[in-house]
Amino acid sequence: TLSLHDALPISAFFTAVSALSTCGISIVNATTHWTAFGQVVLLVSVQMGGLGVMTFASLIALAANHHMKATQRLLTANELGTTKLNEIRGVLTVVITTTFIIESVTFLALFPGLYGINRGNVRHTAREALFFAVMSYNNAGFTPDGAGLHVNNWAVGMPIMASAFCGTLGFPVLLNLMRCARHRTPPRRWSLHTKITLVTTFSLVLLSLAWFLLVEWDNPFLFKGADVETRLRYGVVAAVMPRSSGFDLSWVPHIYSNIPIQPD
């Protein structure tokens, strides 16, 4: 049972705004502070924020009335990155399907690694896998426990990073890539938005990785006795995670002061 102090409205309000905006900043421990119902609300809020307000509102309108007003169609088309109003229903379907496919694949990929970490506790493993799957793809930094990201476990860290990276690209880019793959469109004919997003994203990740490894390779506080694989693993996490996903990197205080790592 939560005490009166623990249930302060400011904590609930702050967490709600953080979840809906998918910024992932939490002033309380999401696992110990909130009840099971509260954690479900947190997951749903992040999912709504990840899909987008207009996307979610359009889904409700379609479910209730099977049609949308012209203004709502224009706003939804703008959010989804399409210029054809008659494509909105199909694009919405693709967006929802893509979201749940990626999150389901992430959940299944995370389960074996988390199962080993949790020593065979299926219920706890399923809860953590679901939490990480939703949070990573929607680029929210909430974690299901106080330990933060399992950066030392590739079986857990890699699916989270891959899902977060896909979520970072955004629906318009993912939709364009899927269409190009279906029609076997060569990269030179991809949309300008897709090209700019991919080039910029990969450039930032590669530059961040190179800079982190260059500066931190001999850091005794972070890599004392570590092998090359461990150094690369930390470097990849440091390059991918802070850009958008917002997951806590508990080892950040050990890096050198001239290489700050902060989320966008």
Which residues does each predicted region cover?
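Membrane-proximal intracellular helices of multi-pass ion channels
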Residues: T1-D264
